[in-house]
């Protein structure tokens, strides 16, 4: 697992180099620890993988100042585990549930227990996202999502995709998008 810990740190560093997240950015994480461990999504949640992934993301948060949002599984309608201060800052209505491994998922459950004042939000519009194990986080990203390609596309046995967002380009043929 020590090798995976370093790989995860490297992946996050490479992601940040391209995504350029700043203090106050909102980052959504969808994660199947089952997939990371080599099993089918939702069948073998792993506390060890949740700990490794959360640890890397927490260090990433400390370096960048981003706010983390961990997507629950479909049994909690893909609600998001966030800090109460994040809900307040982004004016997100909270919903009532406590994620557990079999209803919320191992990752969301672990994150909930690590946070100082965890709450669940029904939905968000994040500035960027990381999807570990094809959990489908697109519903929680701002338009317009832009793929971030890094050199490694797997963590453990899980497929990893990453995205940042950009403002919509509006206007017609006369629109200008950069100052001259």
Curated annotation (Swiss-Prot):
Pfam families, A to Z: DUF436
SUPFAM superfamilies named among the record's database cross-references: TTHA0583/YokD-like (SSF110710)
Disulfide bonds: none
InterPro entries in the cross-refs: Antibiotic_NAT-like, DUF436
Domain of life: Bacteria
Gene3D superfamilies: Hypothetical protein TT1679
Family, per entry: Belongs to the UPF0340 family.
NCBIfam families: TIGR01440 family protein
Protein name: UPF0340 protein RBAM_034070
Native organism: Bacillus velezensis (strain DSM 23117 / BGSC 10A6 / LMG 26770 / FZB42) (Bacillus amyloliquefaciens subsp. plantarum)
